[in-house]
Each structure stands twice: as C-alpha cells, then as structure tokens.
C-alpha cells in the first residue's frame, strides 16, 4: 500500500506533468468544468432519496467520528448487498460512522451534495475523520437521468479532469469541516484496461499535490486489488468495479492504521478569521471578491483557517453555498457605513468570535457624505475604534488587521486623509496582547486597472492585490499560537 503523506510523487510521467497545467499545490485554484467541477444535481427519485437520507443523518448526528463519501462502491459497503456490512460493523461501528455513498455519482454531482447539506454538521458534532473515494463514474456516465443535463464524460474524460473533480470535493471538506482530517483514496482499479490506466494517472496527479499528513493524507491501495501481472484480481470484485467481502476487507485494513492515527491526533484548531467591512468586503461578484483569493493564498502558505461571519453572499443576489472555491463566511455589508457597523458588530459577535479580524471600512461613508473631510474622517475613525473595542471585549488576545481603504475616484483627498489617520491609529493602539497591525492595499492600487465599472469596487486584478496584501500581513504577524501551520514540504 502507498501512503502519500509528507512525500509527494516526484517521478511523474511527462504525460502527467503536461496535464497538471501549472498546478503545484493542493490549494491551487481548480478550473471550472461542467464535466467534473461544476456542481450539478440528478433529478430522479432514487438519487434524491439518498441525498436527503444523508442530510437527515448529518442533521441528527451525535458523536459521529467517521464519515465515508463516495459512489456505489462506498454505498454498498453498509447499505447494499451483504458483501461488506459485517466488515463495516466490525471495523467502524465504534466511530458511529455515516455512509454517504450514492450510486452512480460523478464528481459534479458529489460537489452539489457536499455544498448542499451533506457536510452541514451542527457545531460541536463535526467528525474527526472523513474518507473520500470517487472518480470512477466519470469514465462511464455521459448524462444525467432522462438526459436533462449532458456531461462530457465517458471514456474520453481526461485524467486531469477527474483529478480536479476529486480535489475540488476534498477542498470542500477542508473548508466546511476544518477540524476534520481527510483521507483521499486513489480511485480503485477496474476491469477495463484503458479506464484502469486513467485511474492511475488521475490518482498520481492528486498524490503529487497532497503534501502533509496533518490535515490530508492520500492512500493508494490500487496494487492491493491487482494480480502480480497487473491484471484485476477478480476475486475481489463482483463485476469488475464493485467489491466482494474480501475486497472490502482489504480496503478496511489499508486505511485502519491511518484512521486510528487521525482519531488519536490532537484536535485541529483553525484560526477563525472575520473579514469586516462594507461593499468592498462583500464584493460585487465572485471574481471581484478579495475573499476568494485571500482564502487560497493563506491555505497555500500553510495556515489552517476558517472564515467566520453571518453572511454568505455577494451583491449579485447569488448566495454562495454551492461555491467550493473559497470559504464564503464574512461580515461585509453592502451599502452600510462605519456607524452601522459600529452599532451592529456587538450583535454579530454573539454568534462568531474571531481570532483575527480584518477591517476595511470607510468607503461607504465617503461615498454617501458631503461633510467636511476632517470631521468625516474623524467620525469614521471613532467608529473603527468602537469596532476594535467590541472585538477586544470578546477576545482579549485578538489580532486586528486594520486596512487603509482602496482609492475612490473623485474622492482622492479625503481617502488620503482617512488613510493617514488609520495609520496613526494603528501606531498608537496596538498592545502586546492585542496587536493591531496595518495593511495598506491603497499603496500600489491602480484605479485605471484595478477598479470595476462600479466605482470603487475592485475588479479581479484589484481583488487579487487586496488579497495579497491582507494574506501577507496575516502570514507575517506574530499570532502567538493563534494559528496552526500545516507541516508542508516543498
């Protein structure tokens, strides 16, 4: 068996290197593809019954420590024919496991499931370990039930697309269940030689991207299901794809040591980050949201994070629960000024208390007020001070990143004055216990290139610049135990 924990696959064939297309890290962005990485549902009674079964079990879960997400191979282990049920009970019953298998599932359908309830455990009920096995159906399914939605799948589905779909699901696990360690399984071999080769290629791509054993581990059991000549061991399969009792026994034995290790490991403690602001923080859409890019930047740098807040949407009226590309929780409030935030933040902190807060505030005040610059900026700063006081009252060790605001066309002088006062505030209000540090996205922000059509919201380029500034400040701030860093080897 092969565990890819801290050791990536360094010897990848030239074919696989070409399919990686610049992807070097588990947390790199995943290209959107209708065939493998765009969430989609199946509209038939069976699929929906299983989807809602899992949602009910998750909602009712009490001390569930282990979950399995997959397709019919996973489903059959405890819910199908009796081939694997005894093994399931003997190996995993003590963990009160939930079987999240659903027959026929392909990666875009599984993305729909994990972003629409299958991972919505109550606070305090998140499992310790999750096991993910999927991908094989991407090589066999061409359309949903009844042909309502066509997917470009089947034998021509590239291994890189399958790998991307699996990694997308894995990313959802880590974002939605940050305290749950994940075991990513290599896709098991099948009888068809061509598909078996593609399974190996897809698995090699993901094995090369899983670089630590603190949060995610990659387990490759493919060779355990093959004969010495490389052909399928038919004694382990009922039909060339699904497993016999002995096949399930091999799977259980292969992951048992890692499950035990993860169960006994110290709990993962993500840093809770609250992004506080107005329209700039909420964002016009996903592309123009700095939150999207900041999430990936921090994770690629090894930070174990969890964005927190009461909101999960942009101003385009599209809620974000289907979005697996970043953690969507925030406290950006469209059209609200600093006075509104100062008044309402204590209420919002009743549900979420962050370890780190990032404040970008003042843009709405400047856009909506004709007051003199001096009095206007003084008022904004007073409200920011109230936010800082409210945050410190909830968490005496909080780290606060206070940001200059990005340029506002036609309001350059008042923006400059506010940013000067923000800088001075930071210098005089940071303490050893409750650090306040400055982030300056205004510097280097080009209004001719980085602002969207809706002044002063950033476009994608501007949002990336903001995210880079905030991520760098958080990365370089002495968090004194506020953050855990994953053990990553490059």
PLM region spans:
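Bacterial N-terminal signal peptides that target proteins for export
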Residues: 1-9
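Bacterial N-terminal signal peptides
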Residues: 8-18
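Preference for well-ordered, secondary-structure-rich cores of eukaryotic proteins
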Residues: 91-99, 117-129, 141-143, 152-183, ...
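Active-site segments of SGNH/GDSL-like serine hydrolases
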Residues: 133-139, 145-148, 170-204, 225-228, ...
């Amino acid at each position: 068996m092969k565990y890819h924990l801290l050791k990536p696959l360094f010897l990848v064939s030239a074919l696989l290197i070409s399919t990686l297309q610049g992807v070097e890290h588990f947390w790199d962005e995943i290209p959107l593809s209708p065939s493998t990485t765009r969430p989609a549902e199946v509209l038939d009674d069976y699929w929906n019954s299983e989807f809602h079964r899992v949602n009910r079990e998750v909602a009712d879960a009490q001390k569930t420590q282990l979950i399995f997400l997959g397709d019919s191979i996973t489903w059959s282990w405890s819910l199908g024919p009796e081939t694997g049920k005894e093994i399931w009970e003997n190996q995993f019953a003590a963990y009160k496991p939930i079987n999240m298998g659903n027959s026929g599932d392909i990666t875009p359908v599984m993305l729909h499931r994990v972003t629409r309830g299958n991972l919505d455990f109550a606070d305090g009920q998140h499992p310790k370990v999750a096991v993910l096995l999927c991908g094989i159906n991407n090589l066999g399914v061409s359309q949903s039930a009844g042909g309502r939605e066509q997917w470009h799948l089947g034998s021509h589905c590239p291994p890189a697309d399958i790998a991307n779909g699996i990694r997308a699901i894995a990313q959802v696990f880590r974002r939605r269940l940050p305290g749950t360690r994940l075991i990513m399984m290599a896709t098991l071999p099948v009888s068809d030689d061509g598909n078996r080769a593609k399974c190996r290629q897809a698995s090699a791509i993901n094995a090369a991207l899983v670089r630590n054993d603190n949060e995610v581990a990659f387990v490759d059991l493919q060779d355990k299901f093959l004969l010495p000549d490389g052909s399928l061991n038919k004694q382990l399969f009922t039909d060339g794809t699904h497993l016999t009792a002995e096949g399930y026994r091999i799977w259980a034995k292969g992951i048992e040591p890692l499950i035990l290790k993860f169960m006994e490991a110290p709990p993962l403690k993500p840093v809770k980050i609250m992004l506080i602001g107005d329209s700039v923080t909420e964002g016009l859409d996903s592309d123009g949201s700095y939150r999207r890019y900041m999430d990936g930047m921090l994770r690629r740098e090894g930070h174990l994070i969890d964005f927190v807040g009461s909101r999960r949407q942009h101003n385009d009226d599209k809620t974000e629960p289907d979005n697996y590309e970043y953690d969507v929780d925030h406290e950006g409030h469209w059209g609200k000024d600093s006075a509104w935030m100062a008044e309402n933040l204590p209420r919002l902190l009743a549900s979420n208390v962050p370890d780190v807060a990032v404040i970008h505030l003042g843009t709405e005040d400047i856009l909506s007020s004709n007051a003199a610059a001096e009095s206007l900026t003084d008022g904004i700063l007073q409200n920011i001070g109230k936010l800082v006081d409210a945050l410190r009252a909830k968490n005496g060790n909080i780290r606060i990143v206070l940001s200059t605001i990005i340029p506002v066309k036609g309001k350059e002088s008042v923006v400059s004055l506010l940013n000067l006062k923000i800088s001075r505030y930071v210098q005089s209000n940071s303490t050893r216990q409750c650090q306040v540090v400055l982030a300056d996205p205004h510097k280097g922000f080009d209004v001719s290139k980085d602002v969207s059509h809706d002044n002063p919201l950033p476009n994608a380029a501007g949002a990336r610049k903001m995210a880079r500034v905030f991520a760098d400040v958080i990365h370089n701030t002495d968090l004194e135990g506020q953050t855990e860093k994953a053990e990553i080897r490059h």
